[in-house]
């Protein structure tokens, strides 16, 4: 599974701005709001956001 580096960077950069205020539910909502694609790729995208938020 190869993630688009530009998308990953954009997600990480944007997420760093919200890191202090985001909870688990907010992180999932944030991942969806970032326009993650459907299926496995969306899951990977959401997991990346959750990892950035400090969740295992």
PLM region spans:
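Short, Lys/Arg-enriched anionic-surface-contact patches
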Residues: 2-7
């Amino acid at each position: 599974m190869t993630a688009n580096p530009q998308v990953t960077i954009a997600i990480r950069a944007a997420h760093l701005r919200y890191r202090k205020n985001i909870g688990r539910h907010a992180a999932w909502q944030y991942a969806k709001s970032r326009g993650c694609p459907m299926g496995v790729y969306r899951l990977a995208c959401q997991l990346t956001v959750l990892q950035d938020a400090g969740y295992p």
